[in-house]
Amino acid sequence: MRVGLFGGSFNPAHEGHAHVAETAMHRLKLDKVIWLVSPQNPLKSSHETRPLAERMAGVRRWARGGGMIVSDAETRLGSQYTIDTLRVLRARYPGVKFVWIMGADSLATFHRWRGWTQIMREVPVAVISRPWAALKARTSPAARRFAHARWPSSAAAILADATAPAWVYLTGPLNFASSTALRGRQTKG
């Protein structure tokens, strides 16, 4: 089984997140995409993070279609960091081929994540293009450090079969929805 793991705070979830998940599902030929709703992003203020139940409900509205699963696994595992979650999931499900999914905006700051180099060595990673993030993502410390492990987008369908480190940057139609912009509108409105 080929499973994409799409983690985030989804604060709030929006059509851009759905676009990333759906793009990954199709281009990577995944059987499932699990949206891992983080209890609290360690790089963001807890003051602006909505309650988990509210964010889970928001994700359920966007995670539509066969193979999309919404999970609070990180909360249940007591995991705050992606690297810890990946290690637990890989140990529990050794026959599953996992791929970490992220938007290009996340790759741009990936070097700030705890254990980011270990994440790259733990599972293949798929980066989906996001507006305004392409240059920052492609020149980010993570992209430079793992340039040798970047696969061409034409090989995306077999990325799940790769031995990490392996990653791909997928371009295509862009979706301009943004959690930051949505939060800003809600604050003003």
Swiss-Prot record:
InterPro entries: Cyt_trans-like, NadD/NMNAT, Rossmann-like_a/b/a_fold. GO terms for molecular function: ATP binding; nicotinate-nucleotide adenylyltransferase activity. Keywords: ATP-binding, NAD, Nucleotide-binding, Nucleotidyltransferase, Pyridine nucleotide biosynthesis, Transferase. Its EC number is 2.7.7.18. It catalyses: nicotinate beta-D-ribonucleotide + ATP + H(+) = deamido-NAD(+) + diphosphate. Pathway: Cofactor biosynthesis; NAD(+) biosynthesis; deamido-NAD(+) from nicotinate D-ribonucleotide: step 1/1. SUPFAM superfamilies: Nucleotidylyl transferase (SSF52374). One of its GO terms (biological process) is NAD biosynthetic process. Pfam families: CTP_transf_like. NCBIfam families: nicotinate (nicotinamide) nucleotide adenylyltransferase, PRK00071.2-2, PRK00071.2-4. Belongs to the NadD family. Catalyzes the reversible adenylation of nicotinate mononucleotide (NaMN) to nicotinic acid adenine dinucleotide (NaAD). This is Probable nicotinate-nucleotide adenylyltransferase. It comes from Caulobacter sp. (strain K31). The gene is nadD.
